[in-house]
């Protein structure tokens, strides 16, 4: 396994928190720590009239969030390499901190072609 990739959809979130760049910076930093990841850099941008995008560069890969306060929605992407981190923990913290009433989480393992080749069974001809 190369790593784990989590895609999180957050619905019915706290509109004010989704538009608060400082809050999101703190929350992203905490989420990275909760996942057991090492934060290398964090870039955020607040859009006018609303919305924030945040991108955390992790030693293990990345965490990103894009918010639409007017819809109470946030799109989150967490990818971590190796098996020592827990991206689901970052997702759970973000869900709680943004007050999402509903969410959808998709999680899957990233594999190298060699690992996939050994996992795929070809039927005998």
Swiss-Prot record:
Q: Does the keyword Lyase apply?
A: yes
The cofactors required by this protein are: pyruvate
InterPro entries reported for this sequence? AdoMetDC_C, AdoMetDC_fam_prok, AdoMetDC_N, S-AdoMet_deCO2ase_core, S-AdoMet_deCOase_pro-enz
Q: Name one GO molecular function term.
A: adenosylmethionine decarboxylase activity
| Modification after translation, per record | Is synthesized initially as an inactive proenzyme. Formation of the active enzyme involves a self-maturation process in which the active site pyruvoyl group is generated from an internal serine residue via an autocatalytic post-translational modification. Two non-identical subunits are generated from the proenzyme in this reaction, and the pyruvate is formed at the N-terminus of the alpha chain, which is derived from the carboxyl end of the proenzyme.
Pfam family of the protein (one): AdoMet_dc
- Any GO BP: spermidine biosynthetic process
Q: In which pathway does it act?
A: Amine and polyamine biosynthesis; S-adenosylmethioninamine biosynthesis; S-adenosylmethioninamine from S-adenosyl-L-methionine: step 1/1
In terms of superkingdom, the source organism counts as Bacteria
Pinpoint the site Cleavage (non-hydrolytic).
60-61
Signal peptide (UniProt feature, chain positions): none
Record EC number: 4.1.1.50
Q: Which reaction does it catalyse?
A: S-adenosyl-L-methionine + H(+) = S-adenosyl 3-(methylsulfanyl)propylamine + CO2
Q: What class of enzyme is it?
A: lyase
Annotated positions of the Pyruvic acid (Ser) modification: 61
What keywords were assigned to this record?
Autocatalytic cleavage, Decarboxylase, Lyase, Polyamine biosynthesis, Pyruvate, S-adenosyl-L-methionine, Schiff base, Spermidine biosynthesis, Zymogen
Q: How is the cofactor bound?
A: Binds 1 pyruvoyl group covalently per subunit.
How is this protein organized at the quaternary level?
A: Heterotetramer of two alpha and two beta chains arranged as a dimer of alpha/beta heterodimers.
Q: Which family does it belong to?
A: Belongs to the prokaryotic AdoMetDC family. Type 1 subfamily.
Under which name does UniProt file this protein?
S-adenosylmethionine decarboxylase proenzyme
* Species per Swiss-Prot/TrEMBL record: Prochlorococcus marinus (strain MIT 9313)
């Amino acid at each position: 396994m190369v790593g784990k990739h989590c895609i999180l959809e957050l619905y019915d979130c706290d509109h004010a928190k989704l538009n608060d760049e400082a809050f999101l910076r703190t929350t992203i930093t905490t989420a990275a720590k909760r996942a057991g990841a090492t934060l290398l850099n964090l870039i955020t941008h607040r859009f006018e009239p609303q919305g924030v995008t945040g991108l955390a560069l992790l030693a293990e890969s990345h965490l990103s969030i894009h918010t639409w306060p007017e819809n109470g929605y946030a799109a989150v992407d967490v990818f971590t390499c190796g098996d020592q981190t827990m991206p689901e923990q970052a997702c759970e913290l973000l869900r709680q901190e943004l007050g999402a009433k509903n969410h959808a989480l998709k999680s899957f393992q990233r594999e190298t072609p060699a690992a996939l080749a050994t996992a795929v069974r070809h039927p005998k001809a």
